[in-house]
Amino acid sequence: MLAATDLARILDGRRIADDLLDALKTRVDARVAAGKLPPTLAVVLVGSDPASVVYVRNKRRAAEKVGIKAYDFDLPEATTEAELAALIDRLNADPKIHGVLIQLPLPGIPDAHRLIQRIDPRKDVDGFHPQNVGHLALREFGLRPCTPRGIVTLLGHTDRPVRGRNATIVGVSNHVGRPMGLELLMAGCTVTSCHKFTPPQMLEAAVRQADILIVAVGRPGVIPGEWVKPGAVVIDVGINRLDDGQLVGDVGFESAVKRASWITPVPGGVGPMTVATLMQNTLEAAEATDC
């Protein structure tokens, strides 16, 4: 247990992501030296949402750093679902494309999930396709959702065991919370998932007993830091911009850092790991075509 004067160690996602990207570059260089195609990633951006533009730029920069060739498909906001479906079909059929990334959200398209399902699961480097999530549920390793997989990598860089721990996940989105639960089950945790129907007193109790706390809600300070169990590992997936422009997470950082053993910063924690894991999935998708 931490003493009252101790502060959590910062789980530096930027540094860990950079180390992962360096390792991936070594593998890509070896692949190219062996006469194989470099991994390729089709990046589809619809419209000009500022956040999406930033996310896509970060992904393209990471691809360049690793040696993955990115093909850019920047489409107007008026692009229809039928036009996107036709593009996905072309990318699925192109043997030179190893990974397909559709940046979400898609403006004007209410059912993006239908388009995600259209991506060839072998090229679904986001890991969102139901077939890939199903593999995870069956404890089969394939193209796993990037953010949960990146969080597992982060947990491996602490000095805290994962197997046998109590883990609480706050938020049950299809892209983070639900697959995160599967990842932690596979890692040997006892998992509690909390959501909008979880009574407040039950939510607080679940947070207070968590050795590993993962929060992915998208509401600043939704989890008071005072709830954090002393010595817990806290992974804050949320990134929220306040009226003054400050970026904050879903957990009250100032008080949580005095109780946790490890905690991710916002920004600079989970986000870089998501991007690095996308590159990891893209390389693995390319390697799977060599068999």
From Swiss-Prot:
Pathway entry: One-carbon metabolism; tetrahydrofolate interconversion
Catalytic reaction equation(s): (6R)-5,10-methylene-5,6,7,8-tetrahydrofolate + NADP(+) = (6R)-5,10-methenyltetrahydrofolate + NADPH; (6R)-5,10-methenyltetrahydrofolate + H2O = (6R)-10-formyltetrahydrofolate + H(+)
Name of the protein this chain belongs to: Bifunctional protein FolD
Annotated NCBIfam families: PRK10792.1
UniProt cross-references to SUPFAM superfamilies, sorted A to Z: Aminoacid dehydrogenase-like, N-terminal domain, NAD(P)-binding Rossmann-fold domains
Family: Belongs to the tetrahydrofolate dehydrogenase/cyclohydrolase family.
HAMAP family xrefs: THF_DHG_CYH
